[in-house]
Every structure is written in C-alpha cells, then in structure tokens.
Amino acid sequence: SPRSAASSFGGEGRSFAELDWVVPHLPENKPRHLLGIGLVEDLFIGVSKGIDTFDCVVPTREGRHGNLYTSAGELNIHKGLYRDDPRPVDSECACEVCAVKKISRGQLRQLFKDKNRTAGYLASFHNVYFFNNLMAQIRQAIAEGRFEKLMAEKLSSRS
C-alpha cells in the first residue's frame, strides 16, 4: 500500500528469480525485507538483489540441533571428532560463547550429549551473533564499495 513503511516478502525456497521481477518495482526509499531466508549464501544473494533486511529461524533452529555457523563453514558439534576438541567453536568469533566464556567444542558437544538445555542456548547465541556480525560486515563492505569482494571471499571459504 502507499502508506506502507516497508516491503516484505519471502519464504523458504531456493529460487531468487522472484526478486528480479519484484525488487525493481519497490520504492527505493523504503526498507526491503525478505522473510524466511537465513543461509549465508542466501543472504549474499538477497543483498546483491537489493534486499535490506532478513529474518529467519535458521540461526536458532540449527543451534538447538547442534549445527553451528563459523567463519570456515558449518560445524555439526555432534560429530565424534569434537569430543576432546579444546578449540572454541570459531576462533575468529568475538561472541560470549567463543571469546568470553571460552566454551570449547568438546565442552559444547558434551552439553549436547548430556541433553543439557544450555547447549542449545549457547549454540543459538553463537549463531545469532555470527549472522549479526556477518550483516555488519556486509553493511561495511557496501559502504566501502567492496561488497562483491566480500561475497566472493565469504562464499569461497565456505565450500
């Protein structure tokens, strides 16, 4: 509607073709919000097509199931190889889990194994921080005219 403060649309599909036809018709002076899109690759595609904000359950849902997002890619903390791993979830992360409480991969894995509810909270907290930090990096890269370079770096490090 003409009085709308923003435009929003979305859903969990893998096709972004709709953005190519919808975004050119949205007002440029209002935020463009995409719903249900929360994977790293999808955020970069959305931003490259003119989307400003996103929301999705991915960071918390995946966290509750022991899937963590890191600068090197996704990590499933349930795998046995993390049993005695003393490293933080992500050595490049400054979140409370990684940098302040210094919860190791082994400790977090054990919390999940013990069915301790704190495990899902810690993993979700880390994931939300990861995505907030990623979006801050994207905003800075756009302001500095290096979004394409950041996208190439981040996506190549995840393969």
Q: Predicted segment positions?
A:
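Glycine-rich phosphate/ribose-binding loops and adjacent secondary-structure elements
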Residues: 1-89
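C-terminal extensions of enzymes
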Residues: 90-159
